[in-house]
């Protein structure tokens, strides 16, 4: 009880974060401009008569949004462009985008202060070096060998815009900021409908990248909070493995917050989800929920998730978005790999005194295969080959210099090898390498108006071979396992490169 009371006092102190006045500070929009130019992902900022950022113009835009005629227009003409006023340049799309970036920076401040004020004794230093994408593959290789069923979840979105604002009310106790967020979101969608149009989501994400990520992470954080809370409360075993991959979610404090908000939550219903061994991994709008329980238990979790999204987030999700498969008999698409846990036969000769006999055993092995058909399809879409994998020239690159052509082909080839370096079978990679090599040769031959044979005889194939096998200096981790018995062909070396987050679009089919 004292623990909950202490947390309640901390929760009340969060109400002192009043971030609305920061929207009228010049340096906030300077940060937004610098983020757009120097961010990890380039943000396209629309120019507007070469006008500079100004908090005064943003203030005029906010006042315009709160005027009564603006409200009347938004109700009577929901599809009208309500922020654009071509007679006044400060109502253009440029300043609405700047307001979006500035608002995203401002609302992130309470979360940053909360993270900095976290007590040192509650930190878990051993998890700091695991918050990277390359740690997921060794995790799957070590844990999934002991599991039976896997649920492949497509995290649903669309979600009502009002729900997004209500989710932030638990974290941001600033009414003017929340009202401003409502007005701004009303620009993209009518309040009486869902964001069901993929076109609306695409434009909102493109024009307001930082705000979109903030809202999406808040929604996913809320969903994972309830999911993992029920999972942890339903088992006596610690759930350290799942917490490894949930960055900046503050799991322990959320559990306390849940106890205060919902004190009457009955533990009697938790037996329904009892599962002593379960692992959860989320990536790019999808999630994997693996378990050692029965198929009936997985169906219970599926029903729970569907009802949870329906009654808590107030929207219906299709049951087909959650696929339940048995690991031993199926494969799943994960981060550009086709992963599976097949049972490999192993023949062991055992000799006891004068008698010798053979023991036929089956061992599980986490297998990662390069999706050849999918990657060839993307190469075909990028006009490197035909749909059947036959290499063709790249006409759009013939205006470049020879070195630029070689550099582009070589970069794509190296990225493919770096990203799929942990594959258990490299034959598909060599096939892709052959397609890119011959496509490069055809492109150069087309530029110089000669045949591939004549071009290769003049330059020699050794130059292309040396270029494509050149390795960049990248940091990598090598995960090896020590076994008591070494069998021929039973040990394969896996290398997972650390630069696979920033990669060419071709090697990431999810983009």
From Swiss-Prot:
Localization, per the record, is:
Plastid, Chloroplast
Please provide, in alphabetical order, the Gene Ontology terms of the cellular component aspect for this entry. Answer: chloroplast
- Which cysteine-cysteine pairs are annotated as disulfide bonds in the entry? none
Q: Does the keyword Plastid apply?
A: yes
Any single Pfam family the record assigns to this protein: MatK_N
Q: Predominant location of this chain? A: plastid
Biological-process GO terms, alphabetical = mRNA processing; RNA splicing; tRNA processing
Described by its record, this protein's role is as follows: Usually encoded in the trnK tRNA gene intron. Probably assists in splicing its own and other chloroplast group II introns.
- Check the record and name the PANTHER family matching this protein: MATURASE K
Instruction: Report the sequence similarity comment from the record.
Output: Belongs to the intron maturase 2 family. MatK subfamily.
Q: What is this protein called?
A: Maturase K
What gene does this protein come from?
matK
């Amino acid at each position: 009880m004292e623990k909950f009371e202490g947390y309640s006092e901390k929760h009340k102190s969060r109400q002192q974060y009043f971030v609305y006045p920061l929207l009228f500070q010049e340096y906030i929009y300077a940060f937004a401009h610098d983020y757009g130019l120097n961010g990890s992902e380039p943000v396209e900022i629309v120019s507007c008569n070469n006008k500079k950022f100004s908090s005064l113009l943003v203030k005029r835009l906010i006042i315009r949004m709160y005027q009564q005629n603006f409200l009347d227009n938004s109700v009577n003409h929901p599809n009208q462009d309500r922020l654009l006023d071509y007679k006044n340049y400060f109502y253009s799309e440029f300043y609405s985008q700047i307001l979006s970036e500035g608002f995203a920076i401002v609302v992130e401040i309470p979360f940053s202060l909360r993270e900095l004020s976290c007590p040192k004794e509650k930190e878990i230093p051993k998890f700091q070096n695991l918050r990277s994408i390359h740690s997921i593959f060794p995790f799957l290789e070590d844990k999934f060998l002991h599991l039976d069923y896997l649920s492949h979840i497509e995290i649903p979105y669309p979600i009502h815009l009002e729900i997004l604002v209500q989710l932030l009310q638990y974290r941001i106790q600033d009414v003017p900021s929340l009202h401003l967020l409502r007005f701004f979101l009303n620009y993209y969608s009518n309040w009486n409908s869902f964001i069901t149009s993929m076109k609306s989501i695409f434009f909102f994400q493109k024009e307001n990248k930082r705000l979109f990520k903030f809202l999406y992470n808040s929604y996913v954080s809320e969903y994972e909070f309830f999911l993992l809370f029920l999972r942890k409360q339903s088992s006596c075993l610690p759930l350290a493995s799942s917490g490894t991959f949930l960055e900046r979610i503050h799991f322990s404090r959320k559990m306390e917050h849940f106890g205060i908000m919902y004190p009457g939550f009955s533990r009697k219903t938790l037996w329904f989800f009892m599962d002593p061994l379960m692992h959860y991994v989320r990536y790019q709008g999808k999630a994997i929920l693996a378990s050692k329980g029965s198929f009936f238990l997985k169906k219970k979790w599926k029903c729970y998730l569907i009802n949870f999204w329906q009654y808590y987030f107030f929207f219906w999700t299709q049951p087909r978005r959650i696929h339940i498969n048995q690991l031993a008999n199926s494969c799943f698409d994960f981060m550009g790999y086709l992963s599976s846990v097949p049972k490999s036969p192993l023949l062991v000769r055992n000799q006891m005194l004068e008698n010798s006999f053979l023991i036929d055993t089956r061992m599980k092995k986490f297998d990662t295969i390069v999706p050849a058909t999918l990657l060839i399809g993307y190469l075909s879409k990028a006009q490197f080959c035909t749909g059947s994998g036959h290499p063709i020239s790249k006409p759009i690159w013939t205006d470049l210099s020879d070195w630029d052509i070689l550099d582009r082909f070589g970069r794509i080839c190296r990225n493919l090898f770096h990203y799929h370096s942990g594959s258990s079978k490299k034959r598909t990679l060599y096939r892709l390498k052959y397609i890119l090599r011959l496509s490069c040769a055809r492109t150069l031959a087309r530029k110089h108006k000669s045949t591939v044979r004549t071009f290769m005889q003049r330059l020699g194939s050794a130059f292309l071979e040396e270029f494509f096998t050149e390795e960049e200096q990248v940091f990598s981790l090598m995960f090896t396992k020590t076994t008591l018995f070494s069998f021929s062909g039973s040990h394969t070396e896996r290398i997972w490169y650390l630069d696979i987050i920033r990669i060419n679009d071709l090697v990431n089919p999810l983009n």
